[in-house]
From Swiss-Prot:
Its EC number is 3.2.1.52. It is an enzyme of class 3 (hydrolase). Disulfide bonds: none annotated. Substrate binds at residues 64, 72, 138, 168-169. SUPFAM superfamilies: (Trans)glycosidases. One of its GO terms (biological process) is peptidoglycan turnover. The active site is at residues 181, 252. Plays a role in peptidoglycan recycling by cleaving the terminal beta-1,4-linked N-acetylglucosamine (GlcNAc) from peptide-linked peptidoglycan fragments, giving rise to free GlcNAc, anhydro-N-acetylmuramic acid and anhydro-N-acetylmuramic acid-linked peptides. It comes from Nitrosomonas europaea (strain ATCC 19718 / CIP 103999 / KCTC 2705 / NBRC 14298). This is Beta-hexosaminidase. Its main location: cytoplasm.
Length: 348
């Protein structure tokens, strides 16, 4: 059985029989984990092993493990700083900030890989305009070139541990106050304004080999009436054609309020896939997931399947015990632990 275009979640720290049946459906291609699915590194490793064993090829396992307030796995994992802290260090010592970003990416990826998680939806490429409460300190910086530099460094760290990077939220979520989890979000700027600011990190990352992008549930009416994740203009014309992106496109969660304007969960999935998403996420709504599995008819193209498969990366580290014997990891984790929330590194 090949993979499908849906990424779903599960209820708890162990698979239930309902989870197993749901994840065995041919439309499913991935699982996203949350804090409720985590108790310890050993438990997580057992859970991911069971998920991977359900199917061949195995389901893709993802998580939002960015650092700061968006870090699903905490106890037993290195505490990662908010990305804004790296931006603040960059204002004083760019070389040090780039080094720490790479180290943070390595630690993040190495720990997840050691527990069987394939990828994290990171880095955040949104600019810190000081407008968005939902983005806030998740963003590296206000200046697009600084964001691009730090994100490229973090991606290098991820890749050195065998993990692909996913840039989000295309084409930029930082300039609006609205939280797409709970309301419709509209960015009234022109394409020219977005291109000369928000698209710079995406363009730089694409040129550097970015593997995945997550689209924003934000409407940019000067460009298209549909939000980016439902817009073929954004995903196919601008992202694929103009920016030359050849990697995997993920939707943001189709259960968010900003996505509900597009009809039933099945209609939302259809429109996102038709617009150009390779894989769509449905989170925190088991009834919607079951409805979708019973009603969606979608032929997963060979091209989309290949792009999803490329998100697996490599499993070079097989356990936390092995990881904690590696000098490179110990050094990187030590450096990251010495960064405090005020953006001060003891090595500065």
């Amino acid at each position: 059985m090949s993979l499908g275009p849906l990424m779903l979640d599960i209820a708890g720290t162990e698979l239930t029989e309902t989870d197993r049946v749901r994840l065995s459906h041919p439309l499913v291609g991935g699982v996203i984990l949350f804090a409720r699915n985590y108790a310890s590194p050993a438990q997580l490793a057992g859970l991911t092993a069971e998920i991977h064993a359900l199917r061949y090829p195995s389901l893709l396992i993802a998580v939002d493990q960015e650092g700061g307030r968006v870090q699903r796995f905490r106890d037993g994992f290195a505490r990662l700083p908010p990305m804004r802290v790296l931006g603040e260090i960059c204002d004083r010592n760019p070389d040090r900030a780039h080094h720490l970003a790479s180290q943070a990416g390595y630690v993040l990826a190495a720990e997840l890989k050691a527990c069987g998680v394939d990828l994290s939806f990171t880095p955040v490429l949104d600019l810190d305009y000081g407008q968005s409460c939902v983005i806030g300190d998740r963003a590296f910086h206000r200046e697009p070139q600084v964001v691009a530099d730090l994100a490229c460094a973090l991606m290098n760290g991820l890749q050195s541990a065998g993990m692909a990077a996913v840039g989000k939220h295309f084409p930029g979520h930082g300039a609006i106050r609205a939280d797409t989890h709970v309301e419709t979000a509209i960015d009234t700027r022109s394409y020219t304004d977005i291109e000369k600011e928000d698209l710079i990190p995406f363009r730089r990352m694409i040129d550097a080999g970015l593997s995945g992008i997550m689209a924003a549930h934000v409407i940019y009416p000067a460009i298209d009436q549909h939000s980016a994740g439902f817009s073929s203009r954004w995903l196919q014309r601008i992202l694929r054609h103009d920016l030359g992106f050849e990697g995997c496109i993920f939707s943001d969660d189709l259960g968010m309020q900003a996505a509900r304007n597009y009809g039933s969960i099945t209609r939302r999935a259809e429109q996102a896939l038709q617009a150009g998403c390779d894989m769509v996420l449905v989170c925190n709504d088991a009834d919607a997931a079951d409805e979708l599995l019973g009603s969606l008819h979608w032929e997963f193209s060979a091209a989309s399947l290949a792009r999803v498969e490329c998100m697996r990366g490599q499993h070079m580290i097989h356990s936390m015990a092995q990881l904690h014997e590696m000098e490179r990891f110990l050094q990187a984790a030590d450096e990251i632990s010495k960064i405090d929330p005020a953006g001060i590194s003891v090595s500065l």
